[in-house]
A protein has these predicted regions:
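Catalytic-site signature segments of enzymes, centered on catalytic residues
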Residues: 12-106, 110-113
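Active-site-proximal alpha-helical segments within enzyme catalytic domains
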Residues: 2-3, 65-72, 113-134, 194-210
């Protein structure tokens, strides 16, 4: 999320570029009033505007960056993103239920937020992460990769963001937040109230699924994070 991107993450849906993004990725119904609507997600990603800043200088959350990562995975593996996810993560993690992923009208997988998964399976993946990528099948996720985003590191780009409301002493790397709360607590956050919260020192893994009306509500987040921290504090 430190890529120089002019994308506007506007969950109110007022920004033109956000409307284009959601329409061309199949997340919203196609808005006929949008001019020059991209022909699918790949077309949209290929024409993302720059913010004018140098890469690696400022944190800027942008969902299309995650979609681009999914596209990179497809190019590197010569396979569909959902196939890679299934073969390398879901099957060896012994997930119990079917999962779904959003496709654009041309069949491209939306890796930014188009995956729906059962609570039990989400907890399984979260616990796998807490256990440094290993289960009874052996090592599924490289431990070094998990340690890279769990352990504190330079957070100057994160602190340079325009509106630092979430985790003022934290950081963001590899799609996970370092909370800055101590004990190396880290988490993943989705819109409408989805959370994974991990306290490795207390061997605590929490997931939260929700259908909150607001895509983002910082006050509600702060309340839930306080609850997660207190659960950890109660553990010896």
């Amino acid at each position: 999320m430190n890529v120089s991107s002019g994308f506007i993450e506007d969950y109110t849906g007022e920004a033109e570029i956000f409307k284009k993004y959601r329409s061309c990725t199949g997340w919203d119904l196609v808005d006929g009033s949008i001019k020059d609507l991209p022909q699918g997600m790949y077309d949209f990603l290929s024409n993302l505007p720059s913010s004018g800043l140098s890469h690696g200088t400022k944190y800027h959350y942008s969902s299309p960056h995650s979609d681009l990562l999914g596209w990179v995975i497809e190019r590197l593996t010569n396979d569909k993103y959902y196939n890679v996810l299934s073969k390398l993560l879901f099957i060896p993690s012994q997930l119990q239920f079917s999962s779904n992923i959003t496709l654009d009208r041309l069949g491209a997988s939306r890796s930014a937020g188009g995956i729906s998964i059962s609570p039990y399976d989400l907890l399984t993946l979260a616990e796998l992460t807490r256990c440094e990528g290993s289960n009874n099948n052996g090592n599924i996720i490289p431990e070094s990769w998990i340690q890279d985003f769990v352990n504190p590191r330079d957070n100057s780009c994160y602190l340079a963001q325009d509106n630092l409301e979430r985790f003022p002493k934290g950081n963001y790397r590899s799609k996970w937040y370092q909370t800055g709360f101590g004990e190396n607590q880290f988490c993943a956050i989705g819109i409408h109230g989805q959370n994974i919260w991990i306290n490795p020192k207390k061997e605590l893994t929490i997931i939260r699924m929700s259908s909150a009306s607001d895509p983002i509500n910082i006050k509600t987040e702060e309340l839930m994070f306080s609850v997660f921290k207190e659960i950890g504090n109660a553990l010896v």
